Design a protein with these regions (language model features):
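Polar/charged low-complexity regulatory segments
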Residues: 1-235
Length: 236
């Protein structure tokens, strides 16, 4: 089960890198940042506008951890979209970390036997499943819809152009449905996910658009398509 815990995975080494990047060699600046870290925790430092650009600049040299990199990328993308929600950023960063491993994106959980390559397979599973597993299938419907539409928008657009698949509105609708149903389930609050899933459902198109920006900048930076040009103009 994916949890909103990316910040909890950050290490002392991650925070030392943040201090290094924000201080830029200034001992006075570093001492000030260390005092702020001790007094307020890491959140204000992770929110620093200049941190994102500096992480991108040193990415190939210092190799920031995936946890630090994804959290900062997602957090800043969400804030740019008008979504100031650290718990949601925690959740989405954890989603990217987990779904990037082997075939995790096709399973509702690491140890689940069924693999779902298509959203219709998840819908079929949802209709046939009861109990606690039904909640996990609901969450996975939201997760998988967001992962596909958030990170691979050009692939979706190309398939739609060839009349081989639906457009992004289909993914938005199913993603909102999955997260919405899951947020109303009794297990949502037990897992500490009620508010996160509710926000993801209510703001799904904006969250997806924020991940489009992460995809454009990090995963497919050299690709130029008509769809990307429209996104750059704010037309989604």
């Amino acid at each position: 089960m994916i949890r909103a815990n990316a910040r909890g995975r950050l290490t002392a080494g991650d925070l030392q890198l943040v201090l290094l990047l924000l201080s830029r060699g200034s001992a006075h600046r570093r001492a000030s940042l260390e005092r702020r870290l001790a007094a307020e925790g890491p959140d204000p430092l992770l929110d620093a506008p200049e941190l994102l650009e500096r992480l991108l600049t040193v990415r190939t040299m210092l190799v920031p951890s995936e946890t630090l990199f994804f959290y900062v990328m997602v957090r800043h993308a969400l804030r740019s979209a008008g979504i100031d929600d650290r718990d949601l950023a925690d959740y989405l960063a954890a989603l990217l970390l987990d779904f990037g491993q082997r075939d995790r994106a096709w399973r509702i959980d690491w140890h689940d036997d069924q693999r779902h390559q298509y959203l219709v397979d998840i819908l079929t599973d949802l209709e046939a499943t009861e109990g606690d597993r039904r909640f996990r299938v609901m969450v996975h419907l939201g997760n998988y819809s967001l992962w596909l539409a958030g990170l691979f928008p050009d692939y979706i657009a190309a398939r739609h152009l060839r009349k081989a698949g639906p457009d992004v509105s289909y993914y938005d609708a199913l993603g909102r449905r999955g997260f919405g149903m899951a947020s109303d389930h009794a297990l949502a609050d037990q897992y500490g996910l009620g508010a996160v899933l509710r926000t993801a459902a209510e703001r799904f198109p904006s969250v997806r658009s924020a991940l489009n920006g992460v995809s454009d900048r990090v995963f497919f930076p050299g690709t130029r398509t008509t769809e990307r040009a429209l996104r750059d103009l704010g037309i989604h």
